[in-house]
Amino acid sequence: MASTDQLIQEKPKLLAGVVKASLKALRFIRNERDATIATAMKFAGLDKRLATRMYDDLIGTFTQNGTVDEETQRNDIEVIRQILKMPETIPTQKAYDFRFAREADRQLTQSGWRP
């Protein structure tokens, strides 16, 4: 998920809500395999075999809590740098801000939210 510094500064409550909703969706996807496959079949028009394969192939790439480790951050920045033909890399702390994800994860965990 990406945002601008302007949106973070001007509408932090909106951004917090979007991040929290996204984490709820991720928790649902991770915990409700059959329902997620059925949803993919319905909304993407996939047959069960393909939807199941897609789920099984991708589930390991989904973040647990809305954050990614520093190595993943550096790799992502490097790919973007190459695509945009940027001469310099961007420091991870300038490109990533996980405070909204960490807070949403804390709130959901503390409240005992389950899909």
Identify the function of each model-found stretch.
Residues 81-115:
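Conserved C-terminal helix/tail region of periplasmic/extracytoplasmic solute-binding proteins
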Residues 10-88:
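Secondary-structure end/capping motifs
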Residues 8-9, 63, 96-101:
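Generic, ordered loop/turn and secondary-structure boundary motif
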